[in-house]
Design a protein with these regions (language model features):
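Non-catalytic C-terminal accessory domains or segments of carbohydrate-active enzymes
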Residues: 1-333
Length: 333
C-alpha cells in the first residue's frame, strides 16, 4: 500500500499492512494487521530516527530508509526511537488476532484486548461474555499482571510477548429444555387477539414461499408444531438463548398466542434471547415450522442447499445456551 503517513513524527513511506487502531498512551502504539497472502513490509524515513528495534533486535537502516520485513504468522513489536528521545511503538497483529481484537479505554489508558469473547467495557470494570462456553481467554496489551478476575476459577496468568494472557473459567451450568410434538395446536389460539389482526396473508396460497404465519397464532395447514418448555434459570445465569436446529421454510415462536420470534431457514440454528421475556419460573412456547414446498424456489447458499433434506423437515434438536458474564478489573495507579 503506497502511502506517506505520519507516525508520531516519523514518515512511513509505504506499507503492505493495514492500519487498525492508535492507542494514545504516554508512549503511543500504532496497531496494524498483516494480510496472510502478502509479505508484510514497512519502510520508514531515517530522517528523525535514532534507532529502530523489532522484536527486541536492532534494525539497520539502508541509506535514508529503514526497511522492516515481518512474518505474518505471529505478532511483532517495533519500537521507533527518535533523535529527541521520544519513543513510538508499532504493534503488528496477525489477521486472526485482528479479527478478535477490541480497543477499550480504562481510565486514561487505551488498551488492546484480543479474545473470542464479547467485551463490554465500562469506566469501572471490563465484562467479558461467552454464550454456551464457560472457558475464557484474554490477551491484553500493554501487559500488566495486576488484572484481577472476579468470580473466575482456575485463573492462570502469564506474560506472552507484549501481552498479558489471562485464562479462566466459571462453573458450567447444564440446562435441560423439553420439546415434544404438539398434536392439538388449536388449543394455543388466543381467545382474544394479543396484537391487531394481521390479514396480509389471507389470500396467499400455501405453495408460495415465505412466511405463512401470523402475529396472533393461527394453525396453518401442513405446519409442524412443537411444545417447548424452558426451565427457570439459576441465579448464577443472567440470561440464555434458545437454540433451535430445524429444517423448514420458516420457524415461528409463540408465547401465550403472540408471535415473539421468527426465522427464515439459512442452515444455522434459530436463536431466541429468553431475556426478552419476563422470567417468573419456567417458560412455555409453541414452535411452528412451515415446511418447504416440493420445489424450493428461493436462494440458499450452495453449501446449505447441498445439505437440505426435504424428507426430514422439522426440529432436529433444541437446547439452551447459557450466557456467562465475568467481570475483571485492575487497581488504579
Amino acid at each position: 500500500m503506497p502511502f506517506n503517513i505520519d507516525i508520531n513524527g516519523h514518515l512511513l513511506h509505504y506499507a503492505t499492512v493495514q492500519p487498525l487502531y492508535i492507542l494514545k498512551n504516554k508512549v503511543p502504539t500504532y496497531v496494524f494487521l498483516s494480510h496472510p497472502a502478502t509479505a508484510s513490509e514497512l519502510v520508514f524515513s531515517a530522517g528523525q530516527l535514532k534507532k529502530v528495534m523489532m522484536d527486541g533486535r536492532p534494525v539497520k537502516n539502508t541509506g535514508d530508509k529503514y526497511l522492516l520485513k515481518c512474518g505474518q504468522e505471529k505478532e511483532h513489536l517495533i519500537v521507533l526511537s527518535a533523535v529527541n528521545g521520544r519513543q513510538t511503538k508499532i504493534l503488528l497483529l496477525t489477521q486472526e488476532q485482528a479479527r478478535r481484537s477490541w480497543k477499550i479505554q480504562k481510565g486514561n489508558e487505551d488498551l488492546l484486548c484480543i479474545t473470542s469473547s464479547q467485551v463490554i467495557p465500562s469506566s469501572e470494570e471490563i465484562t467479558v461474555r461467552n454464550v454456551d462456553r464457560n472457558q475464557f481467554e484474554m490477551q491484553i496489551y500493554p501487559a500488566d499482571s495486576r488484572w484481577k478476575v472476579r468470580e473466575g476459577i482456575s485463573v492462570k496468568k502469564r506474560k506472552q510477548g507484549e501481552f498479558q494472557v489471562i485464562r479462566f473459567e466459571v462453573p458450567a451450568v447444564p440446562l435441560q429444555v423439553s420439546c415434544r410434538k404438539e398434536q392439538n395446536p388449536d388449543s394455543y389460539v388466543p381467545q382474544q387477539p394479543v396484537y391487531p389482526e394481521d390479514n396480509r396473508l389471507k389470500e396467499t396460497p400455501e405453495s408460495c414461499p415465505g412466511p405463512q404465519y401470523f402475529v396472533n397464532f393461527k394453525p396453518v395447514p401442513s405446519s409442524l408444531y412443537y411444545a417447548v418448555s424452558v426451565p427457570q434459570l439459576p441465579v448464577s445465569v443472567k440470561n440464555a438463548y434458545l437454540m433451535i436446529d430445524y429444517t423448514g421454510d420458516t420457524g415461528a415462536l409463540y408465547n401465550k398466542g403472540a408471535l415473539i420470534a421468527d426465522d427464515y431457514y439459512w442452515g444455522g440454528p434459530m436463536m431466541f434471547d429468553t431475556g426478552r421475556m419476563k422470567r417468573q419460573g419456567s417458560q412455555e412456547y409453541l414452535l411452528q415450522i412451515i415446511p418447504f414446498a416440493p420445489e424450493v424456489n428461493i436462494y440458499l447458499d450452495p453449501s446449505v442447499r447441498k445439505k437440505l433434506e426435504l424428507s426430514s423437515q422439522g426440529v432436529r434438536s433444541i437446547r439452551i445456551a447459557p450466557v456467562y458474564d465475568v467481570k475483571f478489573d485492575r487497581p488504579a495507579g
